[in-house]
Amino acid sequence: MNEDLTLEEKIKQLSSDPSIGRIVSVTGAKAIVLLDVPRDGAARATADRPEMGTLLAIDTATTVVLAIVSALSVPVPAQRDGESEIWIAELGLVGELWRLEDNGFSFNRGVTIYPALGDRVRVAGKSELRLAFCGTARSVSVGTLRQDVSIPAMVRVDDLLGKHFAILGTTGTGKSCTTALILRAILKENPAAHILLLDPHNEYATAFKEWGEVVSPRNMQLPFWLLNFDEIVEVLIGDPERKAEIEILQELIPIAKGKYATSRNGEQASSQRLRRSPNDPSRYTVDTPVPYRTSDLLKMIEQRMGMLENKHDLSPYRAIKHRLEQITQDARYAFMFGSLTVSDGMAQILGRIFRVPVNDKPITILELTGLPPEIVNVVVSVLCRMTFDFAVWGEGQVPVTLVCEEAHRYVPASTEAGFGPCKRAIAKIAKEGRKYGASLCIVTQRPAEIDPTILSQCNTVFALRMSNDKDQAIVQSAVSDTGSGLLEFLPALGQREAIAFGDGVSLPVRIKFDDLPADSLPRSSTASFSECWQRCDSDEAFLERIVERWRASGNEVEEDNTLSLLADSIQFDGAQSTKPADGANGANGHHAPQPPQLQSRAQQPAQQTARQTYQPRADAGPSANGRSVTSLRRQQTPVAPVAEAAPAANTGSALQALRDRLNQRR
């Protein structure tokens, strides 16, 4: 600046010159700027003052280089008023705008033409911010830029989903709202999406009322035969060291699958595809996802027990038999073991979980609360494995996204923690899912406790406020040097703020997320202790309601599943099925479905057999939601010889009533 200028001329020139300094060093992807120091009473506008994270522009002959401020310092501060001092800004070079023949610009990530020493630096203008952060790719808006709230923060959908993403932040920083906001923005522009969200706290149903298919233990159908061998061993045995029991299952399950296939195909069992003996285990493996009956498994176990001479060898057989009988009578496992009939409904199960067809419900919210704690990891493992296999065998024609909330539960960093098959299933999606159209979203409050292999595969990260040093270090390791300066903000980020970096956004950026509508918020708000503790509105009646809901929850699950089981075993044509009992072929060579507790006794005389039937009896007390609860009691009743059933006069109305009750619950 010319020293002969008057003070007024200096101020006028400073105010008209958009530059804020000049390049004095360039090293790889970094540069250092010597900032112009306002003197003689001159002051820059607030918008022209560089801050941490501010996007700056550097004009070259053919491009405009874009850089992010990563550090600010005054290495030589003034000792007295009026003395000169040196202001330094450290930059990370992140992209460039190429000048086109039509005087327009094209944004490219990365830098091909580096700034030269002495090049002037200025704060990026609105048009440059729009070119850099909005772009032309298929994008959705999730908020605004911290640097300029008039510029929308855009997320590129294909890059976000195709290469996996993570949402990280301390408890209470808005992870659930951020997850809901991003997914809602995607669904709004992509109504034929296929998203499966694992919801361990039952909080997302309210966030996707118009788009979500809610699956809970009350209406879930995940038959046991969909489990692979590791998963069924976890359910029935639970200890991988019990080798004898594992070997028994490994031998008998393929045979049980063969028995079901033979009975289902009847005369087709002699075709070329099923020419071998039904007891030939080589036709099926323990992992083949085909139906089989627990009754067949129990029969074979009992047969083996009868052939053993040494009573000491009975122990593993008894353990499996006891567990099978116990679990099939446990209402909590009804979604897996409760069906009175076994049928091959795999296509229908896949359709409901992965929304094929979409039917205006592009997201499935699978609520895990209410599942037995010991089986949650198994259910998650099955769903994650099915997600990958669905994508593989669908040849990528229907891309699907798996959202894993509280992911540190399922893919912990410790090799000794977690359920191995579950970790392997999620890792497989993370490593190989991109090639087949299976994407992964990881949501967690403890990045340091996540398997680093999984987190390293997430090419886009939304980092909300974090104060833990270990968590910050994990995030830091995932960021390139050019955006590392932004992470200094992590402990000081406000509500609804995040640092976003990776392939899903054009450049590392600090985002202020949009507000969600009040009726679309997840049920994840923090309890107001101070408000609740100022009034006394809890009494003995309140405790009674808690106890009633606590106890009724299991009964309602049992009732809902039992109604479904009854519907499965009844033909809605006015009469019960008159097909032969399971174990005896009908005229067409098929086996009729029969409750599993009868199948194991099919060889006994009918008049000597007792079975457990569900008989409804209305209890006097109301349920947790205020309506009458019909509890279904198991009672021992004799089984009459099979005979042709004549339709009763009122059978049709009774069955219609049952159908109506089922439809109301669904």
What kind of region is each of these model predictions?
Residues 1-168, 395-398, 413:
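Basic- and hydrophobic-enriched, low-structure N-terminal and domain-boundary segments
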Residues 192-195, 361-363, 397-401, 436-441:
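Loop/turn-to-beta-strand initiation segments
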Residues 165, 366, 441:
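Conserved beta-strand position immediately N-terminal to the Walker
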Residues 233, 238, 427-432, 436-514:
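Conserved ATP-driven motor cores of ASCE-family P-loop NTPases powering translocation/secretion/packaging/pilus
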